[in-house]
Amino acid sequence: MLIILMYLIFSGAWPVALVNGHPITFSEFGRNYNIAYHFYQSELKINNKDTSVLDSKDGIAELNRAVLDSTIENEIINEELNKILKPDDLNSIIDEKISKVDLNSDNFQKGAELLYGLSLNDFKQFVLVPKAKEQIMQGRLFSENRQLGDWLKEKKSQSRVVIFIPGLAWDGGGVVKK
């Protein structure tokens, strides 16, 4: 038991939240936090704004809240897409969407690194794939005359979410600061 606990701690595999029984791990949350932090830091620098706001108590709390809420939304979208599409079909559609992006452009690679702090492969995996899934879901909903925002609001209210990060809670519609 101790060995398992040690593995979970050192690998980042312990859950920070559960969404309909599916864990969001500390490593997944931490990765998403770092991507968002780097992006906002880059945006603030580009606009000659003070980046210290990101490191303030309120800045950290808000970024934690926003990143966890976004990660939960991604999980809800994943869950729905896995219900309506076979894995191979979903991957084919994702690949088709991503193939429309010129990933080999020097400017694209530099932008991914400067704005997100990610290599091209990581940018594809952690930014483009979730965005493609969101677009796929949006397309499915459009055919039903529904909007993604409305659908997400409905699904979030129906989801069973448990949050284990101190200072954050689930209010039935999103992540809020306590």
Regions found by a protein language model. Give the residues of each.
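N-terminal targeting/tethering segments
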Residues: 8-120
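Single-pass alpha-helical transmembrane signal-anchor segments
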Residues: 1-9
